[in-house]
Every structure is written in C-alpha cells, then in structure tokens.
C-alpha cells in the first residue's frame, strides 16, 4: 500500500495533503516549522510506515530542512518543477484561485498520476552535500563582491574617476589607496616625495609608481563640493564592505580546496585538463553528487546542464531552440570546464575551432564543447576513473576510421 503526500513548504507553516492509491483523501494538515511541529508530524509518518505503508512525497524544492526531515523518516521524495505544478493546477480549478492546501493537494495528485515522469531524489553523501553548500555560499559571496565592485565603480565615476586607474578594486592596493586619498583634493595635496614614500610602503615598482603619479596629476572635470563629500562617504562605506567580502571569498576558496582534497573523488576529477583553476573542479563534483544512479546516462546529464538544445516537432514543422530550463549552476561550471580545456586539451581546441569555422559564435561553440565533455565526465563519474587524454584521442581516431570505412561501403 502506498500514500502520496503533497507538501507545500513555507517559512512558518507547511501545508500537507495525503491521498491513497485511488486518490481518496487520507489526511490534510498544517505543520508548523518548529521542533514540536515537525516531531509530531514525524511520529505520524513513522506510524504509517510501521503499518507497511510506503510513503512518497512531492515537493517543489529538491533540498532544505523539510527534505532532509522527510528523508530521515524514510519517505521517498520527488522534486517537482514549479512550471509543471503550475500546469497541473488547471486540472483541479476553473479559475486562478490559489492557496497552500490547494497546492499541496495538486502535488499529491500529480505524484499519484504522473510519478512515472518524475525522478525520485537521490541524496548524496554528507561530504558531497557539505561541499555543495560550501560552493553555493562561495558563489553567493562572489556575486556580492561583483555587486560591490559595480557600486564602487559607479560611485568613483561620479566624483573621482582617476582613482579607478590605480588597480583592480578587488586588490588591497586599490582599497588602501582610496582610504588614504578618498577625494581629488587629497590627491592634489600630494607631493611627489610623499607619493613615492606611499608607493614604496605598498611595494609598487618605481616604473608603476611613476606611471600612476602622472595619471593622478592629470586634471579631471570639476565636481561640486557637496557631491564630493556625499560620494566620498559612500565610497568609504563600500570599501569597508568590499574588503570584508574579498576576504570571505578567499577564505571560502581555501576551505573548499582543503575540503575537496580530502575526498576520494578529487583523485579523478582533478585529472580533467583545466589546470589548477580555483573551485571549478570541486564545484563540478559537488553538483554531480555521488548518489548512485543519480544520472541515468550522459544524455540525461547533458539535458540537465543545458548543453544540448530542445527540439520541438509539430506536424511538418521542426524547431530547434536553446534550452532555457536547466541547472544554471551546472551549465556555468561546464562552460568553465570547456573554456579552460581550450589551452590544455588538443582535441578540445580542435573541436572548438571546428565549431567556429562552421559559423557558430563563441558561446554556442563553447556549449557544444561542453556537451562533449559531459559525455566524458559521465563515464568518469559512473566508473570513478581519471581522465586520460591519450586514451581519448586514440578512441576518437578509431571512431573516425570506422566512420570512413562505413562511408566507403555505402
């Protein structure tokens, strides 16, 4: 016997709807997101399982505390795409009405009738999940760093554009310069001797110090004093925030590298020809996970990463378009792998150049190369084996010879 649960999660209270195999309602409840609320619900789930009832749950998000809770209680979890849920709502309503209990009911019924089209969540090991959280938080810090750099750039352009020529804003040199000389007036008051002293203290070469001195002495458009005062205050605030975020990005990078180095998967994933490039390899493995049978085939992996297009057929029409629905984080890291391999892999460079020669722009050519890499990465992941460039080149040569032979026979 099996019960189908629909869970519409929320920050405070989760709506739950339960139906049996015939679609008859078994129960519905609101579960407070508290220790007591989840504990009470957990007892109910355990009682059902003790009676020999199999529990399947549909939920919109594939991770989080509620998902962990359900897995801990032996519930099979099926993540449902929000777009699929939105379309399923129309089966049960004539209007656009919406509520949390209604969504929970739709999830339960959708799982009961369409579970053959869904894939049960295959949780990775705790180590893989921890690495995934680390890499996700790292990317959040990188995005925050980018936002602050953009804000700081816009602020300096408004009153102090010469300061942008000192160095990249993510460097300590640029931020220390801005803190020491926050306005054009402060720079104008500098003597060359004082500047040389500051440059030596910050380990600038004589040539670079002279170049910057000439740059800072060039006049800029006058800016009203009240604008300078306001923008200088904002600039110093942004510099403090950016300094903290830059430090956090570096700390996360070190933590990810150290954590990943202790995992067995590092021995094969680091053999990809991408060089020692930051967190690319750890992020790739974290997104792949280590749950058995998570990826059914390399085609499944390609579709999830969005490296292959979508084909739409209707009558005599056939349209091939870009795949928008995919794991954006995985798409990005596969693009990174493809790009970094251009300077490290002979066949990757040749394939990319071939795509460009056919008229494809950089992004489509890189995406096509990423699709090729995912075929290789799937085999590496499935068999836990390292990458061998020479073996792959030999395999490609045999395939090309076989294809030529088939053409001659034809």
How would you label these PLM feature ranges?
Residues 1-410:
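A detector of single, family-specific signature residues
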